[in-house]
Design a protein with these regions (language model features):
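A detector for short, charged/polar N-terminal pre-domain segments
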Residues: 1-8
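Short basic helix-loop element that most often maps to the first helix and adjoining turn
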Residues: 11-26, 30
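Recognition helix of helix-turn-helix/homeodomain-like DNA-binding domains
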Residues: 32-46
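Short, conserved catalytic or interaction motifs in soluble domains
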Residues: 43, 68-69
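DNA major-groove recognition helix of helix-turn-helix/homeodomain DNA-binding modules
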Residues: 51-66
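Helix-turn-helix/homeodomain-like alpha-helical modules used for DNA recognition
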Residues: 71-75
């Protein structure tokens, strides 16, 4: 498995968790999810529950939202 790109969700969570001084266990407790979920999220596991991802992001004042994807015919 390759390292996550700097703009990825996994990188965001790992970076913010470390900056806050949280262990994976502490972040999981704050978000109401298990340490294993935090580990899976930080490793970009492709099958994560969005409701649980949003619980983790809420600790950092964020949420997943919809944005328009660029179209192939746009410059």
């Amino acid at each position: 498995m390759s390292a996550p790109q700097p703009s990825s969700l996994a990188h965001f969570v790992r970076t913010r968790r470390r900056a806050a001084g949280f262990s994976q266990t502490v972040l999981g407790e704050l978000a109401g999810v298990g340490r294993r979920f935090i580990s899976d999220l930080e490793q970009s596991k492709p099958t994560l529950r969005l409701d649980a991802v949003n619980k983790v992001l809420a600790v950092f004042g964020k949420t997943i939202g919809l944005v328009d994807a660029p179209r192939d015919d746009e410059p």
